[in-house]
């Protein structure tokens, strides 16, 4: 049975989209590995190669989606959408340790480094999210989204303290250093 690899990007971020990708490879692609271990330039090259040589589905949830229905529900809905897109003919492997009660999905810790289809999904999810962050960085350059990628770095927290939140931020995420910052958007 062919494998459909699934991974996500943007799970633990304060800002930006949550992107979930599912990939079924039609042919071998050299250089597939965990997207975090690949340069952005190489990720873009692999993204294009995967899109040409694989069946794939990318599901994106905005910060507002994550705030409205919650991270776990977004992840569950994304997994279900990928499962519905590909159907019953594949074995589904998701990077991590929980399948969010989606029974047909098997989980595997470090699958993004071990299973080429999951590596490909990792690359699609990360490259898609990075494109979203370019939009955020153009609109709000003072936040430095391209440097911290939406994570809770010191520079990102300082930017929120100075400028407040934007529509790219997840307002339901609690960070001690931001406890007294107004949730009104920039």
Predicted regions and their residues:
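RNase H-like, Mg2+-dependent phosphodiesterase core
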Residues: 1-186
């Amino acid at each position: 049975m062919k494998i459909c690899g699934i991974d996500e990007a943007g799970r633990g971020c304060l800002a930006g989209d949550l992107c979930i990708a599912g990939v079924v490879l039609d042919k071998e692609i050299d250089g597939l590995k965990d997207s975090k271990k690949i340069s952005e330039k190489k990720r873009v090259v692999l993204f294009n190669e995967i899109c040409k040589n694989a069946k794939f589905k990318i599901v994106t949830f905005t910060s507002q989606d994550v705030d409205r229905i919650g991270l776990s529900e977004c992840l569950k809905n994304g997994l279900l959408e990928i499962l519905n897109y590909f159907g019953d003919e594949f074995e589904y492997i998701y990077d991590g340790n929980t399948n969010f009660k989606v029974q047909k999905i098997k989980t595997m810790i470090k699958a993004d480094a071990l299973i080429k289809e999951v590596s490909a999904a990792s690359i699609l999810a990360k490259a898609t999210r990075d494109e979203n962050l370019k939009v955020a960085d153009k609109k709000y350059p003072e936040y430095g989204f391209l440097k911290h990628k939406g994570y809770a770095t010191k520079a990102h927290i300082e930017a929120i303290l100075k400028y407040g939140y934007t529509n790219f931020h997840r307002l339901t995420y609690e960070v001690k250093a931001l406890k007294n910052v107004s949730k009104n958007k920039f």
